[in-house]
Structures are given as structure tokens and as C-alpha cells.
Amino acid sequence: MARTRRRGMLAIAMLLMLVPLATGCLRVRASITISPDDLVSGEIIAAAKPKNSKDTGPALDGDVPFSQKVAVSNYDSDGYVGSQAVFSDLTFAELPQLANMNSDAAGVNLSLRRNGNIVILEGRADLTSVSDPDADVELTVAFPAAVTSTNGDRIEPEVVQWKLKPGVVSTMSAQARYTDPNTRSFTGAGIWLGIAAFAAAGVVAVLAWIDRDRSPRLTASGDPPTS
């Protein structure tokens, strides 16, 4: 039976590391893309302006159970330094483990859940510990179908963005409707089974036609049939 609800905590809190960066300029940009198969790929940037020449900014650890799906590299752009993590094809169940990439994680929690053909994103961002009014904290989510409702900014029909304000608690919500991949797979299997059955019936019919009785038959008058 196909599951109609699937829940996974995205827990991107580990990306913010707000406590150690509360007094410095902060840049956190997270972008995630949800595929029609309910797999999530994306990119995380966690960076800050260095306090000195030896400051390399916040670090993300790629040592997670699905490390083959995650690539972590140094980030250095526009005077910000830190880490950049790129991940691909994560399941809803794997996403919570991204929190293990940094032990100082705090600040943001997101959840994705499915209810039939509707995927619901809900989140809460507590940035009360961020004192820098110029902190750049941004989340972008791309769905595989048009967003039906959201409290974020729709930059495209399928893409929603939140620019989170420092010093306050923000909430995020969005919904999109697209077919449950489990249901779609079941339907596809049924179609192929139908095609296979139809093809098998065709083969049987052809074989029956080939093996039909080709012996001459007498007409009702007893005369042999004319050709």
C-alpha cells in the first residue's frame, strides 16, 4: 500500500550556527529542489566576514552516513569565508541527519510531509540571537509543480523564497500538488502489465492462426471447394 504521508525534518539549523556568529556579519543561503520522486538536492552556504586573517569562518563536516551524496568545500566570496555544501538525491529520511554537519547548529527547523498528492513545507526560524541587522539569511525552495499556497515570495510559479529577518522569529509555509511517486510507480507497473498481457494475447492469436487447420474442406454439395 502506497504511503500517503511521509515526513522528514530538514533541520537546516546546522547551517546557521547563529550562536557563534551572533556578533559578526552572517551569510546563510540555502536552496533546495524537490524532485517529482520526493528526492531533495540543494546547496548550503554558511559564511561570515573573517575577524582576522586566520579566520576561515564556519565549517561544515561532510562526515554523514550518506557522505557519497554530499560534497563540502571552502567558501570565499565578497569578503565572506566559510563552507559550502552541495547535496543530491537525499530522501526525506536522510535530511534530518544534515544537522550532524555542525555541532553548533541552532536556529531553523523545516519539515516536509506528504498528504496524498500534496506536499507541505512548514518551518520556523528563530533568529533572535542574531544581532547584526545586515545578516543575510535566505531560503529558496523549488517544487516540481506550481506552488498552490505560501507565505513566502514566489519568484517563479514553482519557486518560493524567504528572506529571514534577524532578531525575530519567522515562520515558513508552502504547498504544492503533484502525484505521489509511489502511486505513480504503481500505475506505471499496471500499464506495463496491461501491455504485456495484451502482447501475450496477440502472440497466442498469431500462433493459433499459424497452426490453424489448412486441410481442404468439402462444400455442402460434396464438391471440393474452388480456389
Swiss-Prot record:
Keywords: Cell wall, Lipid-binding, Lipoprotein, Membrane, Palmitate, Secreted, Signal, Transmembrane, Transmembrane helix. A shorter form (about 20 kDa) is secreted; upon overexpression of the whole protein in M.smegmatis the C-terminus of the short form is about residue 187, suggesting it is generated by cleavage of the protein before its C-terminal transmembrane domain. A lipid is attached at residue 25 (S-diacylglycerol cysteine). GO terms for cellular component: extracellular region; membrane; peptidoglycan-based cell wall. Its main location: membrane. A lipid is attached at residue 25 (N-palmitoyl cysteine). It is found in: Membrane; Secreted, Cell wall; Secreted. Changing residue 25 to A/S: Remains cell wall associated, no difference in gel migration, upon overexpression in M.smegmatis. It holds the Pfam family LppM. Disruption phenotype: Grows normally in liquid culture. Traffics into host (human and mouse) acidified compartments early after phagocytosis, suggesting it no longer arrests phagosome maturation as well as wild-type. Grows normally in mouse macrophages at 7 days post-infection. Initial uptake (2 hours post-infection) by host (mouse) macrophages is higher than wild-type, but decreased growth in host (mouse) macrophages from 1 to 3 days post-infection, wild-type growth at 4 days. Initial uptake of bacteria is the same in TLR2-/TLR2- mice. One of its GO terms (molecular function) is lipid binding. Residues 26-185 are annotated as: Important for bacterial uptake by host macrophages. It comes from the Bacteria. Induction: Constitutively expressed in culture (at protein level). It is a lipid-anchor; Single-pass membrane protein. InterPro entries: LppM (IPR053807). Residues 1-24 form the signal peptide. The keyword Metal-binding does not apply. Disulfide bonds: none annotated. GO terms for biological process: symbiont-mediated suppression of host innate immune response. A putative lipoprotein that seems to be specialized for the initial steps of macrophage infection. A non-acylated fragment (residues 26-185) binds phosphatidyl-myo-inositol mannosides (PIMs). Limits, in a TLR2-dependent fashion, bacterial uptake by host (mouse); this effect may be mediated by nonacylated fragment 26-185. Plays a TLR2-dependent role in host phagosome maturation arrest. Plays a TLR2-independent role in chemokine production during the first 24 hours of mouse infection. An extracytoplasmic domain (residues 26-185, without the lipid-anchor, either periplasmic or extracellular) decreases phagocystosis by macrophages; when added exogenously to the deletion mutant initial bacteria uptake by host (mouse) decreases to wild-type levels. When added exogenously however this region is not sufficient to restore phagosome maturation arrest. This is Protein LppM. It comes from Mycobacterium tuberculosis (strain ATCC 25618 / H37Rv).
